Amino acid sequence: MIRMTKRKILVTSALPYANAGLHLGHMLEQIQTDIWVRFQKMRGHECYYVCADDTHGAPIMLAAEKRGITPEQLVNEVRELHVADSQGFLIGHDNYYSTNSPENKALAEQVYLALKADDKIACRTIEQLFDPEKQMFLPDRFVKGECPKCSAKDQYGDNCEVCGATYAPTELKNPYSAVSGAKPVLKTSEHFFFRLGECADFLKAWTSGASRRADGAVQPHLQPESLNKMNEWIGGGLQDWDISRDAPYFGFEIPGAPGKYFYVWLDAPIGYMASFKNLCERLNLNFDEWFAKDSQTEMYHFIGKDILYFHALFWPAMLNYSGLRAPTGVFAHGFLTVDGQKMSKSRGTFIQAKSYLDCGLNPEWMRYYIAAKLNGRIEDIDLNLNDFVARVNSDLVGKFVNIASRSAGFIAKRFDGMLAAQVSDGEILAKLQAAAEELAAAYEAREYAKALRDVMALADIVNGYVDANKPWELAKQEGQDARLQDVCTVLVNAFRLLAIYLKPVLPKLAEGVEAFLDVAPLSWHDAETLLLGKKINAYQHLMQRIDPALIDKLIEANKQNMQAIQDAPAAAAHEPLAETIKIDDFAKVDLRVGKVLECNFVEGSDKLLQFKVDLGFETRNIFSGIRKAYQEPEKLVGRHVIVVANLAERKMRFGVSQGMIVCASGVDDSEGLFLLDVDAGVKPGMRVG
């Protein structure tokens, strides 16, 4: 086996926002990260995994106010939930901290002052929407109104989820405060900006570049899909980044600027550093060795694809121009769907981590299933609940655990727990040992699905050996004791090798294997040796099959009480009626029935679907921002929709949109988006009025 140079590796996953417990979407990322970290530690590298709660911002402040507690009380309460959720799924954080910490305050100020000294901070007067009832400036997401481009109602202050347009909140038509429902007014305020536009040359080089690791391997900073997106954004021109917010705000006050606070996206990524600094103080590590400009250590961020902009542009630029090292790699992943659709509270598929554990499901079942779907690319993965049951029961119980259960008992009963001193069927074990480096390469590249496919293929070979040698029959035959011990020793060693290869994914089960074999914690290099002439303990069953009834219990536990929602009083924040119009104004809008001929995802967009719609007299190409509500676009083919047919064509970067598809939505976007149905017999081109 190849002995690798010891590496020093710092790993993070995205900071969960401190407003609620974790759900399976969070766990996908933490599991992906944890598997990689456990693998690196098994290889003998010095590897640390840190995370923290993202605690600052207006939403935290307002949520605490609503409950009558302080923001500090709220974030401390939620942190306890997050720690319990993570530990329940066997996530091995070396430190789980908070962005509301003295270390983060000091580091945020240090970074800001360094950027200011390098003339990367600008002060400008801006106009911003202000809630006259709450006496506060409104963040973009707390302003709603009509899209200035397509007039879709109930859109956020920064982008339209219907047509995909981006804009300033001041451009919204008929805006209202999502906090109080009041009509906001414009007020001026001085804000601080990070001059991101001046960082384009550095970012072009960094995003397309790579770092050389201590073992000599070259690590690209970004995945190919991420690089393509960054090239698009950099090519379109980078805008300076507003890094300040006005009081009242829960966060850190900017040095020398009373009443001004760091925007959450400035101090949140610095929270990675703060969590690690806190760990360094506890373990007596040299923090500067890891974050100095010329650091030879490695730093990796595991994130969701929706926060790429911050981690692949804003964060490395901020680090570089404050005199610190940039990341070695940013690894983005896709979203989690359940049974082919976005997680849904009403369907019971918005699964909370705590609920999964409380229903009695083994966290290693989910760790294995998610790993079996993950690769190094930015692809959404689907948790198919029927497949989840079938795969775990087949792979982990039927193939893997079955090897030990069919052999270990004979070693205990017939040979007093003693393995044979040598084996005659060494070829099968040599084959398993030879797979170690290829499996290691798959784990290193985050190609977990490939690694687990290969491990299960090896398990199939071992189970073939079981069936060919039938230890239960050997046990009945006189004079076959030596052969029985030989065969069972081969099987116990094969089980041990497979357990080594699965340990990053199944750490608790691996502990059970280590106790059964009476060995020290298994490392990757232990695959080089065999366990011979050693006494082992009696085998204890390591994993149960999934009872499908547990899945039914889980779904029921996560179903939202729809009747309670229907009976609940209306929220204080409501969308005011638009300005009264005359019948002549309405007559200007030409609504037509259309029939969907084609519907596809739009590459490069997380929000849009591309429709080809038959309007009777012609076929139109229409982009619609309803992807999150319709995860299976092929199922919309043949459906009738309502189209604003005389809307001016709009050129988008994906093509020209020739109309708008009408949808229904509530004030709260969590209520969903819904296409409108028409009765049978309708024909494309019919006018709606």
Curated annotation (Swiss-Prot):
Nucleotide-binding: present as a keyword of the record? yes
**EC identifiers of the protein:** 6.1.1.10
Start and end residues of each tRNA-binding domain: 585-689
Q: Where does ATP bind?
A: 345
Cofactor(s) recorded in Swiss-Prot or TrEMBL: Zn(2+)
Q: Which residues bind Zn(2+)?
A: 147, 150, 160, 163
What broad class of enzyme is this?
A: ligase
Which reactions fall under this protein's catalytic activity? tRNA(Met) + L-methionine + ATP = L-methionyl-tRNA(Met) + AMP + diphosphate
Example of a GO MF term: methionine-tRNA ligase activity
Identify the residue span(s) of motif 'KMSKS' region: 342-346
- One term under GO cellular component: cytosol
| Assigned keywords, A-Z | Aminoacyl-tRNA synthetase, ATP-binding, Cytoplasm, Ligase, Metal-binding, Nucleotide-binding, Protein biosynthesis, RNA-binding, tRNA-binding, Zinc
The main location is cytoplasm
CDD domains recorded: Anticodon_Ia_Met, MetRS_core, tRNA_bind_EcMetRS_like
Q: Which Pfam families match?
A: Anticodon_1, tRNA-synt_1g, tRNA_bind
Function of the molecule: Is required not only for elongation of protein synthesis but also for the initiation of all mRNA translation through initiator tRNA(fMet) aminoacylation.
Instruction: State the similarity comment.
Output: Belongs to the class-I aminoacyl-tRNA synthetase family. MetG type 1 subfamily.
How is this protein organized at the quaternary level? Homodimer.
Write down the HAMAP family for this protein, in alphabetical order. Met_tRNA_synth_type1
Q: What is this protein called?
A: Methionine--tRNA ligase
Organism encoding this protein: Chromobacterium violaceum (strain ATCC 12472 / DSM 30191 / JCM 1249 / CCUG 213 / NBRC 12614 / NCIMB 9131 / NCTC 9757 / MK)
